[in-house]
UniProtKB/Swiss-Prot annotation:
Belongs to the FPG family. The keyword Lyase applies. This is Formamidopyrimidine-DNA glycosylase. Its cofactor is Zn(2+). GO terms for biological process: base-excision repair. Keywords: DNA damage, DNA repair, DNA-binding, Glycosidase, Hydrolase, Lyase, Metal-binding, Multifunctional enzyme, Zinc, Zinc-finger. Involved in base excision repair of DNA damaged by oxidation or by mutagenic agents. Acts as a DNA glycosylase that recognizes and removes damaged bases. Has a preference for oxidized purines, such as 7,8-dihydro-8-oxoguanine (8-oxoG). Has AP (apurinic/apyrimidinic) lyase activity and introduces nicks in the DNA strand. Cleaves the DNA backbone by beta-delta elimination to generate a single-strand break at the site of the removed base with both 3'- and 5'-phosphates. Monomer. It comes from Prochlorococcus marinus (strain MIT 9515). A zinc finger (FPG-type) spans 259-293. The gene is mutM.
């Protein structure tokens, strides 16, 4: 599943590519991709003649802020003059990704949603496993109230709220493994399997440790490691091990730089001990027994 760095990479690509993109036509190729509104035609009508004003990210969710354009508008010089038109929210789930096509072709087998502007440029959403979802939340409603997972998210790893005081309270008396804590989106938003493994390795902490046993100096190292690993991956365009692509169809390159993830049986870069793999809460976990305590 695309994690914070992959979703941030997509967000940046969308923001750079979709300048003055006014949605003129919406084509739903798979109705189950539209999670809200229930009536799919409300989704279509809500997006039509909407200017995609800004792309935000919250955890693994993409959020496009929309402005209402006149049906005759083809270019907007002053976006501030337009009324807000709610938000388009996207969760890529396991295999979702976008492509931007100036010369659209017929939709491929796994095309789920197609958005066209006045020049027939196409923003295409493709999803092999079809777990990804989209919501159009009209102005006046809060996406956090409509989308349960979005409203339950913990703080962003880069935010001021994600500090040592917060982490200390979170792990207090917790017998869960520290890795399961990091994977809990209600505790910290956006970290998944890849970056939990990599961050714990960088901090020298065993993923199997009970959270309550992590001392303050270790928490400090872990917080720094999380931020550094995420920033490094964003700089590399994220990680691709299966279906993730950026808007240009390129793979992320962070997978070439991992220390433990998907390196089972290979030598640790630091101590030459072999990287091991074992499941925690049903998730494959990669670690170095010697470097992580």
């Amino acid at each position: 599943m695309p994690e914070l760095p992959e979703v941030e990479t997509v967000r940046k690509g969308l923001e750079q590519k979709l300048k003055n993109f006014i949605i003129k036509r919406v084509e739903i190729c798979r109705e189950s991709t539209v999670a809200y509104p229930i009536d799919k035609q409300d989704f279509v009508k809500g997006l039509q003649n909407s200017l995609i004003n800004k792309w935000d990210r919250r955890g693994k969710y993409l959020i496009a802020k929309l402005k209402k354009a006149d049906r005759n508008h083809t270019y907007i010089e002053n976006e501030m003059s337009l009324k807000n038109n709610g938000s388009l929210v996207v969760h890529l789930r396991m295999t979702g990704y976008f492509t931007f096509n100036k010369n659209p072709t017929s939709p491929c087998k796994h095309t789920r949603i197609r958005l066209f502007d006045n020049n027939n440029n196409e923003l295409r959403y493709i999803d092999v496993r079809s777990f990804g979802q989209m919501w159009w939340v009209r102005e006046g409603l809060s996406p956090k109230n409509i989308i349960k997972g979005l409203g339950a998210l913990g703080p962003e790893p880069f935010s001021e709220k994600f500090n040592i005081s917060y982490l200390t309270k979170i792990i207090l008396n917790k017998t869960r493994s520290i890795k399961s804590i990091l994977l809990d989106q209600t505790i910290v938003a956006g970290i998944g399997n890849i970056y939990a493994d990599e961050s714990l390795y960088s901090a020298g902490i065993s993923p199997f440790r009970e959270a309550r046993t992590i001392e303050k100096h270790e928490l400090i190292k872990l917080r720094i490691a999380i931020i550094e690993v995420l920033k490094k991956s964003i700089g590399a365009g994220g990680t691709t091990f299966s279906d993730f692509r950026d808007l240009e169809g390129e793979n992320g390159n962070f997978g070439l730089q991992t220390n433990v993830y998907r390196r089972t049986g290979k030598k640790c870069h630091a101590c030459k001990n072999l990287i091991e793999r074992q499941k925690i809460s049903g998730r494959s976990t990669h670690w170095c027994r010697k470097c992580q305590k």
